[in-house]
Amino acid sequence: SGHLYYNDEALGLMSGVWHCTPFVGKMGAYGVDEFMHVLEGSVTIETEDGTETTISAGESFVIPRGLVCKWKQTEDMRKFFVIFNDPAKSPISDASALKVILPNGGDAVNKVELTDPSEFIGDMPTQHVHNYYLDASSQFMVGLWDSTAFDRPVQPIDRTELMCILEGSVTLSDGAGNDQVFSAGDAAFVPKGANYKWTSTEFVRKFYCIFKPAEAVAASTAAE
């Protein structure tokens, strides 16, 4: 059972919450790219070579499209998910290198070089990022991000993003009086094109799963 918060069939992108009783799937190539954040229970992913990876409540993981694996679930499980079912079936360069990806909030991060003060109200923050996964189409990406406090003006967001807050808190707003506070342990979903304003007064760390359509990626690259 589950509930979809977002479903764009043309893009092949959907996000929601999913609950399932125990089951064991068949070994086979995973048909989609999927980011998952486990809310309750656990699951073990077994790959072709017999390696088993168990993911439990509070943890996140990625199964890349094409990974040959088996889903083994011995208890009830509830998760948030983002699925990208690439309509173009972009060629996977090296299927043998695919693996279950486990983002870790303690992983090393690289400083983001911010160059445009107009993106912020007041001082530019210090931000860091660690990218874990970019799909074969270069549109679906998962990573770890952190930032010192900052305030950003409201504007339409150029991507669809599910964020899982690991540390700190942030107020997300549409600029029209609809403010929501998200703190460590919370998740927020923002669809592309939504009016989006970020205000944080403390250090924030999050996992992100972003889908940035190819045309937006190209425009962003051209703008840089």
Whereabouts are the PLM-identified features?
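A short, N-terminal "cap"/entry segment at the start of jelly-roll beta-barrel domains
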Residues: S1-G12, P87-Q139, E224
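Conserved short histidine dyad/triad with adjacent acidic residue
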Residues: G2-Y5, L11-Y30, R65, H128-N131, ...
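Conserved hydrophobic/aromatic beta-strand scaffold that supports enzyme active sites
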Residues: S15-V17, F35, S60-V62, V142-L144, ...
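Short, flexible domain-boundary/linker segments around small modular repeats
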Residues: G16-C20, V43-E48, G143, S147, ...
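Short hydrophobic/aromatic-rich beta-strand segments that constitute the beta-sheet cores
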Residues: M27, I45, K79-F81, V154, ...
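Short, conserved beta-strand element in jelly-roll/cupin
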Residues: A29-I45, P156-L172
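Short acidic-glycine-tyrosine-enriched beta hairpin
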Residues: D49-R65, A176-K192
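Ligand-binding loop in jelly-roll beta-barrel domains
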Residues: R65-K89, K192-A216
